[in-house]
């Protein structure tokens, strides 16, 4: 079935990141439009992702057309900051700590979507400005064809076989790239120890990437052996990229670890189509859309009352078995993100 929810014009906008909305004022003057700025990962490579289905259903039910712009988590927040005096987006979807950053910068207004009471308190803002719409976890990917056995530790990645065959997205720009710092600081026991490791890893690192989603095709083709990612995005990508395998690094002698990295959505302050934005957020948290999170998107429902039992949900449960889930101090990370990224730049020379 053809999916036309993602408009070519909107998709092209992210390349230039202008200060005004795509298509000038035409979108803003059209009352049957809602504009979404989102971190990448929820749109399918072949039009078969969660966003593709959710936006199509929403358009059919409401007659409201979804204009969609995607990029790195930090990239989308930075764009919204530049447009703050003349907002172009109605809904912002990004990952921690960037959703907290957006809130701190006054980019989000309070709105409680229908069904938000079914979302865990840890997965939504206490002040009511954002909520998770898809739960997710940080992870790494490897090429299963070239590496019959996935690496298991951070230390293995320092081996010479990974020289120019390893890449992770840019901390401070990409949500999953920032997650590399968060997990390394947790696993190695602090900022200093993590930066010492990442300095060593730089010998094998191809270089920066603003988008995590663009790394998976390189891993699937064997251009890279290892990259960072997240469970939802990479599991969905593996349907069309058969060489992708998901794994979670451990310290040598330790357990593999990960942490929740939900796609969180909020209504933009001064949104040009506030009511349409509210309707879309309601739809994203509806029982139907939440049931589709695992069925179609390969992720985890944000609503606690949605118990997925489909094949994808069972496979995801097996994937997470034995992996220790820790909870980052998001307030600390949001407050000190610039400092952590600066330390990373100094350590790696990026």
Model-predicted regions and their roles:
Residues 1-35, 350:
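Short, low-complexity disordered leader/linker segments with a strong preference
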Residues 8, 25-91:
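Conserved N-terminal structural module of periplasmic/extracytoplasmic solute-binding proteins
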Residues 37-51, 71-75, 87-223, 256:
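Extracytoplasmic ligand-binding site segments that recognize negatively charged/polar headgroups
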Residues 97-103, 220, 225-245:
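A ligand-binding cleft/hinge motif common to bilobed small-molecule-binding domains
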Residues 136, 198-201, 208, 242-269:
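Periplasmic-binding protein-like
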Residues 139-146, 181-185, 260-274, 292-296:
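A bilobed periplasmic-binding-protein/Venus flytrap-type ligand-binding module shared by bacterial periplasmic
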Residues 268-324:
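Mature extracytoplasmic/periplasmic domains
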Residues 311-350:
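Extracellular/periplasmic bilobal clamshell ligand-binding domains
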